[in-house]
A protein has these predicted regions:
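Catalytic cores of nucleotide-sugar-dependent glycosyltransferases that transfer UDP/GDP/TDP-activated
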Residues: 1-502
């Protein structure tokens, strides 16, 4: 199968969030399964220069002229390879749009021309597919930044020889980010205004690029089975639950996998000691002591160490941490926070660290090495999200034997099995899970974890249950292949029956 994946970011070329990890790991898994995969992303020179382990890229002879509204925009095409794979990567190089400090925002403000930038990128993907003669069986677009691609394929690409049966799959990674713009930006797309209607591209008078992808793609996916159900409800659908409900038969939830070449305690180069499920107690003890020492916390092997690596926002449940912080810090615990986000929560966590230096460490910003060390060195991991389409850190935690404490939403509900008596007896439990979005409920579950942490055999069983499951992309990639086959089948004409067939 020939597959083109289009994404606004992908590790190791650029990254702002989990989309970048998925856009890299899924193509590699598909290629390992024998498929011909091409990845197309923008080239962000300033970000690329700062990416650790960024691979070399080279110029190609291909130059694109892309229509954006009434003007033509020139771009170069660079070429690289996803490390550890045979996945070809084409990077669209257009400095006016992409040679910036950020991908979508700068100084906490969205770029005012984001619509124009990603309309350009979507059209550049189509032009690259044509000029490179890729002839894909399926084009897989991701989130609002590439939401125009399914519409362009439906309206324009099907007129091209060899591309008339190309199918489209559109993945929703987070309903909260929809790419909503002034209605007059519709002219940038180059599509007829007849498509600016409530069934396709219009949302309460605005152009909505996420809705565009949802409307035009042959098959839709999102990043966990539970989230696929949630987004068809008013609570989680962010205003698009109606159109998602109307396409329920075309919507598939697939839990993301983990790139275990990067995230695995047996091979992780950032750890004080590598370990496996067979020596988890010894390995994690060494990693815990190293983490406590690095962060200036007292090295106490028997105190439960809770960690968080996250955007510090309300969506990630930091309001709950604030609600229960005082009573939590009355307990004999240590807390480690790594991340950035809402200044209110950054200040809260800085203040907790200043007031309780023997119990709390707060690092504002992102550090790849430290994020691995937090996953390996902590005993438990906090993810009390208000909503969570998939989540990756809870799966990293399970792989590393770090017991997750999560709210049962989205992918968290699909990956973490609560340590109830029944689940423990069945050997299924791997963490702690709760439903109410309240600080006292989070605190109660942290107390549950503290109590079970003192019961070493039961705690070890929780760790080993999580570590023994295959969290890699192998199974998720196979599910995507079935989705691609389904999309392709919708675009292939039914064979005509001969006269003697009944």
């Amino acid at each position: 199968m020939r597959i083109v994946v289009a994404s606004s970011e992908a590790v190791p070329f650029s990254k702002t969030g989990g989309l970048a990890d998925v856009a890299s790991a899924l193509p590699k898994a598909l290629a390992r399964a024998g498929h011909e995969v091409t990845l197309i992303v923008p080239h962000y020179p300033q970000l690329f220069a700062k990416m650790p382990d960024a691979p070399p890229v080279e110029s190609t002879p291909l130059a694109l002229r892309v229509a954006v509204g009434q003007k033509m925009v020139d771009a170069r095409v660079l070429k690289g390879t996803l490390p550890g794979s045979n996945v070809t990567v084409y990077l669209i190089d257009q400095p006016i749009y992409f040679d910036r400090k950020g991908v979508y925002v700068e100084n906490d403000q969205d770029y005012r021309d984001n619509c124009e930038r990603f309309v350009f990128f979507s059209r550049a993907v189509i032009e690259a597919v044509r000029h490179l003669n890729l002839k894909p069986d399926v084009i897989h677009a991701n989130d609002w930044q590439t939401g125009l691609i399914p519409a362009l394929v439906e309206v324009e690409l099907r007129q091209q020889p060899g591309l008339d049966h190309t199918a489209t799959v559109f993945t929703i990674h987070n309903m909260a980010f929809q790419g909503r713009f002034w209605h007059w930006d519709m002219h940038l797309t180059g599509l007829d205004w007849k498509y600016f209607n409530w069934r396709q591209m219009e949302y309460f008078g605005h152009l909505n690029l996420l809705k565009t992808g949802i409307s035009f793609a042959d098959v839709l996916t999102t990043v966990s089975p539970t989230y696929a159900r949630e987004i068809q409800t008013p609570e989680y659908g962010c205003g698009l639950h109606g159109i998602l409900g109307s396409r329920a038969s075309d919507l598939v939830g697939i839990l993301n996998g983990v790139d275990t070449e990067i995230w695995h305690p047996t091979t992780d180069p950032y750890l004080a000691q590598n370990y496996s499920v067979d020596n988890v107690e010894i390995g994690k003890a060494a990693c815990k002591a190293a983490l406590q020492q690095r962060l200036g916390l007292p090295v106490r092997p028997n105190v439960p160490l809770f960690g968080s690596v996250s955007r510090m926002t309300g969506q990630k449940g930091f309001s709950l941490i604030g609600q229960c912080a005082d009573v939590l810090l009355d307990q004999d615990v240590q807390l480690v926070f790594l991340g950035s986000g809402d200044p209110r929560y950054e200040e809260l966590l800085r203040q907790l660290a200043a007031e309780h230096p023997d119990k709390v460490s707060t690092t504002i910003g992102y550090n790849e090495e430290l994020s691995h060390q937090v996953e390996a060195g902590c005993d438990a991991f906090l993810m009390p999200s208000e909503f969570e389409p998939c989540g990756l850190n809870q799966m990293y935690s399970l792989i590393y034997g770090t017991v997750p404490i999560v709210r049962a939403v989205g992918g968290l509900a699909d990956s973490v099995v609560d340590a109830s008596d029944q689940n423990l007896a069945a050997g299924a439990a791997n963490g702690f899970s709760f439903h109410e979005f309240r600080g006292e409920t989070l605190f109660w579950n942290i107390c549950r974890a503290r109590t079970m942490y003192a019961d070493k055999p039961t705690w070890r069983k929780l760790q080993q249950t999580g570590m023994r499951r295959d969290w890699s992309w192998k199974h998720s990639a196979a599910e995507y292949v079935r989705v691609y086959e389904r999309a392709i089948a919708k675009r292939r004409p039914e064979p005509e029956c001969s006269g003697d067939e009944r």
